């Protein structure tokens, strides 16, 4: 009896070449459904349509095609079990030896919707639901379960290795190969189901507590090492459809490292605060996950030069993120400093040519610098902690000006700039700014006044007339008094201390503007 292959694919990549080999080299009989059968027929190959094979037409607009005993009996039958073989014979069912199925493009559909912008959420959800595959998962799960007798391919990238396996095995596949294929199926299904559950949760905006946490990724790249050379590391992308950094285009430079990716993500979060079209050109320079220079300017070059001047020592070997396309003038200046990575939404061809002078410099283009993970996860002994990403930014209209001195429009704009930056500095975090440029950054100190001192010391005399932002409230008035002594004229902080009145009184005494946002931005 000839061997039977069942093919039903959404992604037709490599399909014809595979079918040709199956028929011409290994004598398979092909059974196929819908568009897959049409593609095979157009290639001049013999193929039996599923509806003809089962004797049942496709119904419900194609929703039911392969859910039939002749299909699933053929897949699930254990050839080594006499009773299964007898059932096949009595029901005129032939055993299926190969299942080639890839799933409806659910992830691609929702990614396309996000890229195009969703104007009708209900219709978008309905369109996404139509891409939830039923027959495909059923077939590949059945084949994976019966991998002792059936080979299953759920990804076109497997076709070449399968044909090599047939060649070396004289037309047969080995058990280890089939086991690996079965594992691939269950990994794919876990990823697929997770994408569906995540999208439904977001689309339905459920407020119910999430009782299960599913973390599943597809290995994109084995990294040279982790934070340190003795630590192994792998880069996983969220799904089979590349998004975020997995979708970024690396124009040049060495392979990305673990630390590069961690710092790039931190840089993306900072620059995302300044991604609106009306925002001035903005540049953020980061080192070890903390901003060391953030600035805005009339041009991208001016913004970069201001950010670099904010702390040129720390910028050495840093990460640079920009909210505008890299232009030639900026590229020429970028090459004068040793940098690890640069990321921007675009890079002009002439600028890319200039940057090639630094062959090791990693230059990445990520058009969408705004979209990031909705949830952040940290591993702890015995489990994980998950929280909503800190995407809140309290607008000036919701601030409370708690001092007698009131801010000017220019001070409000400066306070907003400082507030956007301090949100992305490790706690306890203090940022001193002026002219939409960071002058001093106090990060990661165990007491707040310690971070104040570091930021002010770094700013030096430039702190005169500057603005100070704090990610958390001031427990005492010492930070306010220290800031005033350095020449700070406006402060922004969350408020919420039982001693807020002491800080307010000190600010009034010293003639400082102070705004409370009501929102804390701890970052650990």
Swiss-Prot record:
Per the record, GO CC terms? Answer: cytosol
* Keyword Transferase among UniProt keywords: yes
Pfam families from the UniProt entry: AICARFT_IMPCHas, MGS
Highest taxon of source: Bacteria
This protein's pathway reads:
Purine metabolism; IMP biosynthesis via de novo pathway; 5-formamido-1-(5-phospho-D-ribosyl)imidazole-4-carboxamide from 5-amino-1-(5-phospho-D-ribosyl)imidazole-4-carboxamide (10-formyl THF route): step 1/1; Purine metabolism; IMP biosynthesis via de novo pathway; IMP from 5-formamido-1-(5-phospho-D-ribosyl)imidazole-4-carboxamide: step 1/1
Q: Name one GO biological process term.
A: 'de novo' IMP biosynthetic process
PROSITE patterns, per this entry? MGS
In its keyword annotation, does this UniProt entry include Hydrolase?
yes
Q: Which SMART domains match?
A: AICARFT_IMPCHas, MGS
What catalytic activity does the UniProt entry give for this protein? Answer: (6R)-10-formyltetrahydrofolate + 5-amino-1-(5-phospho-beta-D-ribosyl)imidazole-4-carboxamide = 5-formamido-1-(5-phospho-D-ribosyl)imidazole-4-carboxamide + (6S)-5,6,7,8-tetrahydrofolate; IMP + H2O = 5-formamido-1-(5-phospho-D-ribosyl)imidazole-4-carboxamide
Please report the stretch or stretches of sequence annotated as the MGS-like domain.
1-154
Which InterPro entries does the record match to this protein? AICAR_Tfase_dup_dom_sf (IPR024051), Cytidine_deaminase-like (IPR016193), MGS-like_dom (IPR011607), MGS-like_dom_sf (IPR036914), PurH-like (IPR002695)
* Protein keywords: Hydrolase, Multifunctional enzyme, Purine biosynthesis, Transferase
| An example molecular function term from Gene Ontology annotations | phosphoribosylaminoimidazolecarboxamide formyltransferase activity
Q: What is its EC number?
A: 2.1.2.3, 3.5.4.10
Matches recorded under PANTHER family: BIFUNCTIONAL PURINE BIOSYNTHESIS PROTEIN ATIC, BIFUNCTIONAL PURINE BIOSYNTHESIS PROTEIN PURH
HAMAP family found in the cross-reference section:
PurH
* UniProt free text on domains: The IMP cyclohydrolase activity resides in the N-terminal region.
What family does the database annotate?
Belongs to the PurH family.
Instruction: State the protein's name.
Output: Bifunctional purine biosynthesis protein PurH
């Amino acid at each position: 009896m000839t061997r039977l292959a069942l093919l039903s694919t959404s992604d037709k990549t490599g399909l014809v070449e595979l079918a040709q080999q199956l028929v011409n080299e290994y004598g398979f009989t092909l059974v196929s459904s819908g568009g897959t059968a049409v593609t095979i027929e157009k290639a001049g190959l013999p193929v039996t349509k599923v509806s003809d094979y089962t004797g049942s037409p496709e119904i419900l607009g194609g929703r039911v095609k392969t859910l039939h005993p002749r299909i699933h009996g053929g897949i699930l039958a254990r050839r080594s079990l006499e009773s299964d073989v007898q059932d096949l014979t009595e029901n005129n069912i032939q055993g299926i030896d190969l299942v080639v199925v890839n799933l409806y493009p659910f992830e691609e559909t929702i990614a396309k919707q996000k890229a195009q912008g969703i104007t009708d959420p209900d219709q978008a959800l309905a369109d996404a639901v139509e891409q939830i595959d039923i027959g495909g998962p059923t077939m590949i799960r059945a084949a994976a379960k019966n991998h002792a007798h059936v080979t299953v391919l759920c990804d076109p990238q497997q076709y070449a290795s399968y044909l090599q396996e047939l060649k070396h095995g004289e037309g047969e596949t080995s058990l280890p190969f089939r086991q690996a294929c079965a594992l691939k199926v269950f990994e794919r299904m876990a990823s697929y189901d997770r994408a569906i559950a995540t999208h439904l949760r977001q689309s339905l905006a459920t407020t119910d507590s999430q009782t299960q946490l599913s973390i599943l990724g597809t290995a994109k790249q084995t990294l040279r090492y982790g934070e340190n050379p003795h630590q192994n590391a792998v880069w996983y992308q969220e799904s089979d459809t590349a998004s975020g950094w997995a979708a970024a285009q690396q124009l040049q430079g060495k392979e990305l490292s673990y630390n590069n990716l961690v710092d790039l993500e931190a840089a993306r979060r900072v620059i995302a605060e300044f991604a609106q079209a009306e925002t001035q050109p903005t540049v953020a320079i980061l080192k070890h996950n903390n901003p060391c220079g953030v600035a805005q300017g009339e041009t991208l070059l001016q913004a970069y030069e201001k950010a670099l001047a904010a702390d040129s020592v720390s910028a050495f070997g840093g990460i640079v993120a920009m909210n505008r396309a890299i232009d030639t003038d900026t590229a020429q200046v970028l090459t004068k400093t040793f940098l690890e990575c640069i990321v921007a939404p675009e890079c002009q061809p002439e600028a890319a040519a200039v940057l090639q002078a630094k062959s090791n410099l990693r230059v990445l283009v990520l058009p969408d610098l705004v979209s990031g993970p909705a949830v952040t996860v940290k591993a702890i002994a015995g489990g994980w902690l998950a929280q909503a990403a800190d995407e809140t930014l309290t607008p000036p209209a919701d601030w409370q000006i708690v001092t007698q001195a009131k801010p000017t429009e220019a001070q409000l704009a400066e306070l907003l700039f400082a507030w956007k930056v301090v949100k992305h500095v490790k706690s306890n975090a203090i940022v001193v700014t002026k002219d939409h440029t960071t002058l001093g950054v106090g990060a990661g100190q165990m007491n707040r006044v310690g971070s104040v001192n570091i930021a002010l010391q770094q700013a030096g005399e430039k702190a005169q007339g500057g603005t100070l932002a704090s990610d958390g409230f001031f427990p005492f008035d010492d930070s306010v008094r220290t800031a005033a002594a350095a020449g700070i004229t406006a402060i922004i902080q969350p408020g919420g201390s039982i001693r807020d009145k002491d800080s307010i009184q000190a600010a009034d005494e010293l003639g400082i503007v102070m705004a409370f946002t009501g929102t804390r931005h701890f970052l650990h």
